[in-house]
Amino acid sequence: MTRNLDASAPFRVVFVCTGNICRSPMAEVVFRHLADASGHGARVASSSAGTGDWHVGERGDERTLAALQRRGYDGSRHRARQFTADTFDVNDLVVALDRSHERILRGWARTEEDADKVALLLGFLPNPTTLDVPDPYYAATEMFDDVLGMIEDATRSLFRQLEPALRPGSRTAAFPFGAS
């Protein structure tokens, strides 16, 4: 995947899970933190969405917000939204949190270009032991911390792959990833 970057058009990443109240908000917040901490906050933007509409307009799950806060992140401004086919148009990379989301997103893709934007978050790790970030929604609170750890590792790996294209003077981002 290749995309021209300029100061007026940040590279846009959307993270997608089921209800947009647990996993994808974690990834969005962590990615935004990495972008801001690296000085690239103006050149990259992150958002999140869910494949379902059950929680549209709601805040993140309280256990999600607590896990983020324990690690020094602020997810308090998050409001759940649903991914639609139009979401492909405003994003450069669509990151699925598990293979079921990946299948759904590829099914919603209207073009090959849309489908090529879809990648699995754990696929950015050098040697993933799984490709699915487990859904902590029905699990104990500790699972939220474990899931956040997985998301942090994979999001850091994703950002490391993206970061060279965000440096001043870089006009084109050619990514070693794309369709997974």
Residue locations for each model-derived region?
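Conserved active-site segments centered on acidic
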Residues: 2-90, 163-170, 175-178
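Phosphate-binding/catalytic loops
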Residues: 2-4, 93, 99-180
